[in-house]
Amino acid sequence: LIDEWQDYPVIWDAVRIEVDKRQLSGQFILTGSNVVDETQIRHSGTGRISRLQMGTMSLWESQESNGLISLKELFDNPQMEFEVLSTLSVDDLIFAACRGGWPAAVCAKSKKAALSVARDYVNTVCNSDIMRIDGVRRNSQLTRQILRSYARNISTLAKTSQMLQDVVASDDMDCTRPTFMDYVNALERLFVIQDVGAWCPAIRSKTTIRSGAKRGFCDPSIAVALLGLTPESMQMQLNTFGFIF
């Protein structure tokens, strides 16, 4: 297991060469928290290395959901009938959304510590990671404003032009469309922003092509942290919770 290998990309080619020599599978696991600079890799690794994008923990993985309903079963058997009851209350779900699926938050010893993980993550992204990803100097305040715009528009089909106006209107922030897209691209490479692509069960339907992506993050707790919400305030804003959950 080699963690954060993207900080030393030569590891990729070294692993590829070693795999060719041994002619065995399942020998190495390379993990990283952001996208590697592909120009530093000599070979794609096709046929030797498979890529898998992972996310934060689901309620089933954190052992909070009873897992009695399977999405796969619902698709495989549309006529299936079931009578199950969630063990989680609305307050439990609100807290889970505010806390997020971060392993450090799930395993935290107190609720206060659990809720601080997402806030710390956002601060690190805005103050450090946004520049470390490719060495380009970026404005931490502008980064935060762009993320806040995403948070306000989470789970909606908000257009880029709409969010750009939102950013510019905040604190007289100056931002052009190319600059906005540069920041968004960097945040996507950091796996912070993860929009949900259009989906339609009718594969050949034009609706799939015409529908835009819904705005989203790798974890709902990021939106909560950016909007300055708490489990208590979220209980008074169930409509907002619906978009976040």
Model-derived features: positions:
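Accessory nucleic acid-recognition modules appended to NTPase machines
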Residues: S110-F245
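Glycine-rich, phosphate-binding/catalytic loops in enzymes
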Residues: R16-V19, G45-I49, S233-M234
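Residue-level signal for well-ordered alpha-helical positions
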Residues: A14, S44, S65, G228-L229
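Conserved catalytic/switch belt of AAA+ P-loop NTPases
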Residues: W12-V36
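Structural recognition of the conserved hydrophobic beta-strand(s) that form the central parallel beta-sheet
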Residues: I2, G26-S33, Q53, S62
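Interdomain motor-coupling "hinge/lid" segment immediately C-terminal to the ATP-binding subdomain
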Residues: T39-R152, T156
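Conserved RecA-like P-loop NTPase ATPase core
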Residues: D3, V15, S62, G100, ...
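Conserved P-loop NTPase "ATPase switch" module shared by AAA+ and STAND
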Residues: L1-I11
